[in-house]
Amino acid sequence: MEKVILFDLGGVIINWNDDWLYDEITSQLKQPFEKIKSKYNANLCSLFESKINENQFWNIVLGDDNIIDDKIISKTFLKKSSINYNLLNFIKSLKDNGNSIGILSNLTPETSDCIQKNLLDDFDYHFYSNSIKMSKPNPEIYDYVCKQIPSNDILFIDDKQENLDAAKLFNIETILFTPDDYDSGLIEKKISDYLN
């Protein structure tokens, strides 16, 4: 049976760290991100699933009279993120060797617009939370992915353990992506080991 390797975008294919955004939010609000973190996290899935836009998100998190730039998420993403071209080339080599590759990523509608989709044309599967109206780590997204892929042999690489833990419940193999493990060659080795 064909093996399928799915990759997250932000924090994996795209160099990204959530702390960059939290620092920008702290700077604009002139108060620690920790003060709004629970409300922020409680509403993030609605943003990822296109149930609300960035403006509505901030009105819910901070109230209607907030002072934050309501495009802070997409602006920070555009300003700070970059493509990991070395990893992207490695991923494309997996496809050249007969494997199927895909993307499973949480994106806001606004950050989705920041991504050069032509860079991702070679991917066989595209699962974007804002398009399919489901987000990680909610179980329904993994159920949906498994039903869309005609293989029971799926590997998922993500930078958040909670997303991987949920994937494991659907018999998806997982690898936690960290920059150190990538720089040392461990991520590519684990993927190669999975394929052999």
Question: Predicted segment positions?
Answer:
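N-terminal helical cap/lid subdomain that shapes the substrate entry/recognition surface
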Residues: 2-89, 97, 108
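Generic enzyme active-site microenvironment
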Residues: 6, 104, 156-157
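Non-catalytic pre-domain segments flanking phosphatase-related domains
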Residues: 1-7, 153, 196
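Generic structural signal for small/hydrophobic residues in well-ordered secondary structure
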Residues: 8-11, 50, 103, 126, ...
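Surface-exposed amphipathic alpha-helices with a cationic face
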Residues: 88-96, 146, 168
